[in-house]
Amino acid sequence: TAVVVPFVMIVLFTIGVIVAAQKRNYEEMVQDVSLKQLGSLTNNVTLELRNFLEAPFQINQILSHGISYHQLYPSADLSAVENYLRSSFTRIYQPLQQIDVISFGSEGAEYVGIRKEPNQKYALMVKDARTAQVLTIYQSDRISDDVRSSIADYNPKLRPWYTPIVANPEPAWSPIYANVDEKQEVTLSALAPVMDGSQLLGVMVTDVKINTFNAFLRRLHRNTTALVYLTDNQQRLIASSSKSSIVSWGTEQTQAGERLLATESINPVIAAGSEYARQHQLTQNKSTQHFSFAQDGDRYFSLLTPYHDPHGLQWYIGVIIAETDLLGTLPQKQEKSWLLGIGVSVIGILLGLVAFNRIMAPITTTANTARRIAQGDWDSQLPKPGQIYET
């Protein structure tokens, strides 16, 4: 016992140190690999998002300058602005899939807009003297008897894309809001004032169709298996690689028609990652946060990165990837190698104990016999003779 117990303890301690060192090295490796992979995906999303948003913003400023420079808004009749927007949209900016509507709202509460339709056609929306100050949406891009819908008492000056420019007449982004047309889609608008000297004439608006960015995120998910989502500074979803809608049907925290909180996402992994970020207040640091969490027995790594642009957007880009997707079968192989190592060590201990017993048996027998003889037991049986080999 005096020899065997220390031997076993030393072997077990050595095994524990080796396993702990391997586990630590694995954790350092997986953290490093996940950070690099998630960082690369985040950079890709950031670049695509910047290009996605910058083009509509620049176009909106060009259109605003054109209306002001050519003095297209002299009266309550917006036909000149209508023709300018129609020709610009259909001839120049039609390839930009993210642009949904370009429109103009005036200080006189008139409104004109051209909306892109799914069939590659356009719909005209007008509220001016020609429509008796009723917002009228036509089936085509011209005023006709073919009316799709009408909205009475529509005042563009009360819309969330108009009031920010009144408060600060500088190009900016609107809050994310729902349109009041028959589609009521979630929209982000690029805003620019139309000025006559220092006088505000109206607001030029270019609506960005956010669900077109969802298409990019879903392609990214198919190619990498990573989940990607965008949230605003209130952690409400803006876009997601998940196919589920970001609009609520009514929950405890979100009214029907509003955007869901990220923690309410239909996708359980996005919801779990967002809940972890909320509980640990990761968005309060205003810096990139790398973390891992568990969901349904699987481990996931996530990178939460702030996104800012010069025009007022304060969003977050969340990227999530599963450990199995990140490293393939390496975790399973690592676990098998640990089990194999432990098994080999146990066999080694057992073989060592057998060897020790074979070596120590004659010694302990001789010692016990000598002790009994010393105590006067002359009938003690002597151990069997053996041979000693010099090595």
Question: Where do the PLM segments sit?
Answer:
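Membrane-interface helix-start motif
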Residues: 28, 213-219, 321-341
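Juxtamembrane extracytoplasmic/periplasmic/luminal helical "stalk" adjacent to the first N-terminal
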Residues: 3-4, 10-98, 171, 186-187
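Short, hydrophobic beta-strand elements of compact beta-sandwich sensory domains
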Residues: 202-209, 301-330
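Short N-terminal helix-loop-first-beta-strand/juxtamembrane motif that initiates sensory/input modules
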Residues: 58-61, 92-110, 117-141, 167-173, ...
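Membrane-proximal alpha-helical signal-transduction linkers
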Residues: 358-386
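Intrinsic low-complexity, intrinsically disordered coil/linker regions enriched in small/polar
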Residues: 146, 153, 157-158, 197, ...
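Extracytoplasmic/periplasmic ligand-binding sensor regions of membrane-associated signaling proteins
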Residues: 127-213
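Cytosolic-side ends of inner-membrane transmembrane helices, especially those
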Residues: 6, 16-24, 336, 340-361, ...
